[in-house]
Amino acid sequence: TKNHFKFFFLMKDYTSDKNFTSKDFVENPLQKGEYENCTFNQCDFSGQDFSEIKFADCEFVECNLSLIKVVKTAFREVNFKDCKMFGIQFNDCNEFGLNFNFNGCLLNNSSFYKTAIKKTLFKNSKLIEVDFEECDLSNSSFSNCDLSGSIFLQTNLEKVDFRTSFNYSINPENNRLKKAKFSLSEVFGLLDRYDIEIEK
């Protein structure tokens, strides 16, 4: 009976293959539990507590996720598309299997401090004043992203592709840049600390 109750409890908290559209989760918060292969379209989660919720193979499209709390939240193979994601402390997430990608998202003032997020794709996104300090971004790609004011310090940027991104400032002396890719037109972002003038 004890095991039966445990099984029932786990099943109750597990949701799969469900599509949530135009839901206001500010008024009715998302139930704690595990979500697998679910899609969230045009939902409002702003300021909500995602702590200890597990998302696997899920997609968020045109959602407002600004200032959500993600303490021990699991994101495994999760895609965010055209989402508003201001001020999220991704460094609080469950590190096990942490894997996500961002396309067309606003991630301003968010933090990935000390996270290990290799092979992450950031595409067509704004990352204004985002904290990547001591983050492992190796083999990631920033495709057509605005990185104004973002912090790269003791960051592993090996094999990261910055070629189509802009407004970044990266000190080669304080970051690992082996085989990272940059475009000639934006490479001056590696020379900011030297206080030299470069004519385009």
Features from the language model and the residues they span:
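Tandem repeat scaffolds
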Residues: 5, 10-200
